[in-house]
């Protein structure tokens, strides 16, 4: 059986941070396959459509939140994946700071005028 291929959807506010590195390491361990990090593996592609094309090629998406919400880009990536029957997981921290994963069943727009807290992810 081939290894899973995943996409790490996260806020650009986390790019090149220790938080990004910690999340990425956790996702790699959890996925046990190839993980595409747009910041590291893709760079600036411009339009969201280019990132959605990459998502078409993966088995699942791991998303992280920023202050309990996802920004417009992560929202669009997760919504696209869900509509295309690609599994989406949200990576969160418990009260002790330990990462855990939940499967996402829906993405909901919460504030179309704020691209940082644009939506939220509803997990099982």
For each predicted feature, which ranges?
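Conserved catalytic or regulatory cores that recognize and/or transform ribose-phosphate-containing ligands
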Residues: 1-124
């Amino acid at each position: 059986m081939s290894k899973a291929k995943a996409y790490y959807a996260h806020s650009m506010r986390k790019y090149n941070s220790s938080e990004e590195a910690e999340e990425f390491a956790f996702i790699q361990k959890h996925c046990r396959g190839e993980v595409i990090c747009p910041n590291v593996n893709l760079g600036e592609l411009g339009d969201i459509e280019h990132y959605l094309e990459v998502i078409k090629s993966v088995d699942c998406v791991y998303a992280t939140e920023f202050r309990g919400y996802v920004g417009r880009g992560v929202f669009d990536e997760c919504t696209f994946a869900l509509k295309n029957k690609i599994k989406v997981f949200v990576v969160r921290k418990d009260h002790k700071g330990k990462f855990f994963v939940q499967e996402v069943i829906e993405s909901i727009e919460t504030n179309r005028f704020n691209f940082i807290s644009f939506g939220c992810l509803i997990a099982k």
